[in-house]
Amino acid sequence: MDSKFSFLLIVLTLTLGSCKTQNVDTSAINLVKNKLPEFSWDKMPLYMHLRKSTSFSNKEIQYLSKFPLITFEKTTGSKTFGSTEKGTIKAAKAVKKINPNAKILYYKNVVINWGGYSEDENFLYEHPEALLINAKGQKSVMPNGKTGFFDISEDYVRKYWLHHVKKVTENPFIDGVFLDANIKVLVPGFFNSRVGEEKQEAIKSGYLSMMADLDSQLGDDNLLIANILRVRPEFEDSGRAYLKFFDGSYIEGFEHESFGMAYEDYLAQGIEAVQKSAREGKVIAMSLGIGKGLKNAEAGIDDVRKKVSKHEDFSKRLEYLLAIFLVCAEKYSYVYPHDGYGTEKSAVWLKTFPQYEKPLGKPLGFAKREGYIYTRKFEHVDVWLDIKNKTSKLNYK
């Protein structure tokens, strides 16, 4: 771990010394030899999760450099630099020039063969049989009808996946991995309907083995964040048992009604799971959609929402989402109220809001709950949240 950060310091010093587009004081660089992100209660602790297939402008990099924790999604930089791997590293390097303490995660799906990864393409060219097939001998696909899956029940496929992730994270500008589609693997319904129960169990077993290997091989030096906590009937305690492999959880699909549960009951159960995990010191990257939730073909797995207009007043909605976050948050909890992750169509990209800049202060205790009403006091704000009526108040002192 020390060697990784030492190398980063050397590279940054040399790079910054020759940088013509950014005016940065290299003497001020102070790399934190800790895989956890920087955290402060001074203001709202924010997370960033995004994708852009072309290169980022200087303005965009300056904006990104303000976030302590960033995930660059699939396709990042792939059109400009030829692959997601190269595009992510280029973007990470640019951010690190300005803020070397920002923690940057490389997105890698645990099973879905998303396009744009050059190493995946090369591997599948040599091993086309590594893709999952159904009982008819046809490629098993996502709801889009074309994107396939890696057959992670096979040992050689898992070894390739681990080698790929290890190679990218060895780059000094990458601090860890964001792991997606865990829930698709763990709940029986998704793969049962595609490849049958026996194969689904083999995929799940392969996944558990792969995550254990990931933790043992990369966990000491790299931040491992998984899209894992979720209220589902198949999970005990909302999937918290799987956090043993990871440093924390990304949160989505958090705030709607599902599986016959009322909105407020589903959300209350999710809040409880996040509170428990955050209090145990797990990193929480809470992603909350500003737009109205839409039904999805894989209900309860993917969070799909209506876009919001750039001219729309969503201040009340934003305050409500921040109140949800604040009744859950502990040290190493971060929030991203968003309008989708693609920068081209997002109404909140490059924007900030007054609630992000107002003083927050340390919490003066855990949140208190009475029925569906939560309250919590911070040094500079009192939070009141009613999840049954979907209302909130942030009373700044």
Protein language model features and the residues they cover:
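Positively charged n-region of N-terminal signal peptides that target proteins for export
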Residues: M1-F5
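Sec-dependent N-terminal signal peptides
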Residues: S6-L14
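C-terminal motif of bacterial Sec signal peptides marking the signal peptidase cleavage site
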Residues: G17-S18
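Glycan-processing catalytic domains of CAZymes
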Residues: V24-K397
